[in-house]
Amino acid sequence: MYYEPSRRQFLQASTAAALTAAGWAAPTGRLLAAEETKPKPKLKKAVKYGMIGIKGSVQDKFELIKSLGFEGVELDSPSDINRDEVVKARDATGIVIHGVVDSIHWNVRLSDPDAAVRAKGLEGLKTAIKDAKLYGGTTALLVPGKVSNKETENYEQVYERSQAEVRKAIGLAEESGVKIAIEVVWNDFITKPEQLVQYVDDFKSPAVGAYFDCSNMLKYGVPAATWIRKLGPRMLKFDFKGYSAKNGWVKIGEGDEDWPEVLKALDEVGYHGWATAEVSGGGPKELQDIATRMNKIFGLG
């Protein structure tokens, strides 16, 4: 293996020293206030698998993120990764694969005007659900569609088509114990919390909920805490990064997110679960920086 126990200790120590030498300091203002906000929701740190930028086996990668304090990971599906290797790495390291991300939902959309494309997208969602079950995950993240034009893929069409296709996967999700988690992105489809509430509730199934990314939603003008409070128990998972209206995507803790209010809202709705970073990753140094920033915001050990 690349990371034996002594190696992990070395990585932690050397990375911490490197960050100090580089003059990294926790951002002030809202981020500093977030550290002092109480009560805090109980959150567990995770990363997207694609953020782990080292060469080596799945187990090597899992060992690295574990050495940096991450408890979980989210994989893509469908993918060409060796499923047996993933399961063995999970069991060997104790890293939790808490869910998967539908890897084809953006280009092979459930809202596409072509029924054949929608059928292929549905198979992708079903594969994601099956993989999530195999890995022991609880969710399959899905972007249900995209408003691409007014004639063939407008809001109403995206709503109706995606609802129809997702319904075809609900039975499998219920049988598998895996929930379909609807994520809101910059797809011009769902831009208000009330729309996401309605979209989820229209399925009338506990197997469908919301996957919320507070940074994505800053673009649409409604505070993240408002989204969280309106979603309430519908919120299954929580992604975060950093977004600034002035500078675009920034490092975690350097954006416009009102983290103290986000933490307060998470606690109010009883969200205690995974907090998954979705940012540019890298090697040990970059991943350690991400972990440190998450710890500063969420007060995690």
What residues fall within each predicted segment?
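Histidine-acidic metal/acid-base catalytic patches
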Residues: Y2-A46, M51, K55-K66, T138, ...
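Active-site acidic/histidine proton-transfer and metal-coordination neighborhood
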Residues: A13-A26, T37-P39, S111-A210, K219
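Hydrophobic anchor at the start of a short beta-strand
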Residues: K45, I97, I180
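Structural motif corresponding to the early beta-alpha repeats
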Residues: E71-A164, N216, K246-W249, H272, ...
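Glycine- and other small-residue-rich loops at beta-strand/loop junctions that grip anionic moieties
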Residues: L75, V185, G255
